[in-house]
Every structure is written in structure tokens, then in C-alpha cells.
Amino acid sequence: MNSIIKEHYFEHKSTIELARDILGMRLVHQTQHVKLSGYIVETEAYLGATDIAAHSYRNLKTKRTDIMYQPAGAIYMYQMHRQVLLNFITMKEGVPEAVLIRAIEPDEASIPYMEIKRNGKTGSELTNGPGKLTQALGLTIKDYGKTLFNSNIWLEEAKIPHIIEATNRIGVPNKGIATHYPLRFTVKGSRYISGQRKGQILTEIWQ
């Protein structure tokens, strides 16, 4: 059985380290009827007060971002256009940094249920984007404020990537130097990475 991630996992790690280290972990959502899960293959780090691309830049605090000031493991859901995005708070209370989950590889047993939630989408289209994966997992804005440690959403140790790549974050234009921060982390070769080209897909991506 995979080990469930507890509070101590986040201690003494930076947000960048966590964004890399959770690649390959199994993200689980226990719904009322079924357990849905997938393996994280793409993340982005957001570095709080000094990161102009972060919602908490300059320690901005609003009703929406209030959760970012909670301890590591808090779940920050927010809506962008018609999509809901999933983030985990990464640092101690009062330090508003987070990791955005951008893509997952569906657990095989979850695929039939995810296809229903994604209105018939199949293959990589199921979960190859931050709004797609939340829909596939059945996550909604109502999950805002939960934590990874005492709710129906959690992480488990699962797989180890062969290679992790770091590139610029997606959708961060006109943010000065922050536009070019290499804070997007991916499991090299995963077919589920957002915007992945067929020629970049590898058959062996896990150790």
C-alpha cells in the first residue's frame, strides 16, 4: 500500500523542491461513490510575495487568497474562466507560496469514471491541463480550504520519474522577469503534459 503524505513531508522543503518532489505522487479524491486518482506529471511553483505572477505578490491578501496564508497542505481552489484550478499551499503559516497541479496521468481504474466526468473525452484529453484534471477528479470550488491531511483529498507516494524537466510557466505573460522563471516541472515524455507533442512522448517515463 502506498504511503500517505503527512504534514512532516512539507517541513524543511522549499516550494520549488516540493513542486519537483510531488511529481509521480498519486493524487486521490475519495468521492461519495468512487475513489478517483492519478499520478502528478506537471506542476508549477508560485513564490508568493516576491513573485509577480503569484496571486499573493507583495503579500496581497483578499478573500480569495486568504487560504494561501494557511500552513502547508491547505488546498487553494480558484476559478479561471470556466475552469477550476487546484493548488497546494507549501510553506508555514503566513508565507503565501503554492504549487499548481497542471496535469496528471489517470490511474487505470479511474479512467471510465473520468471519461464520464469529462463528457466523453478520452486519452490524454482527460487530464492534460489544470482545469481538465479537476473536472476528471470531480474537484470543485467547494474544495477550497480543505487540507491534504484530514479530508477526502490526499497524496500518496507512488512513482519516481526517470527525468524531470524545468521550463517557463505557462500563461504568465507580461510579468517581467517572472515570465521567464523556470518554475514549471514536468515528467519528461509523459503524454499527459499540457501541450505535449507526439514526437516528445516517451514509452518509459517512470523508474
Curated annotation (Swiss-Prot):
An example GO BP is: base-excision repair
Highest taxon of the source?
Answer: Bacteria
Any single GO molecular-function term of the entry would be:
alkylbase DNA N-glycosylase activity
Q: Does the keyword DNA repair apply?
A: yes
Q: What Enzyme Commission number(s) apply to this enzyme?
A: 3.2.2.-
Say which enzyme class the record assigns: hydrolase
Q: Does the keyword DNA damage apply?
A: yes
The alphabetical list of record keywords is: DNA damage, DNA repair, Hydrolase
User: Belongs to which family?
Assistant: Belongs to the DNA glycosylase MPG family.
Put simply, this protein is called: Putative 3-methyladenine DNA glycosylase
The species this protein was found in: Listeria welshimeri serovar 6b (strain ATCC 35897 / DSM 20650 / CCUG 15529 / CIP 8149 / NCTC 11857 / SLCC 5334 / V8)
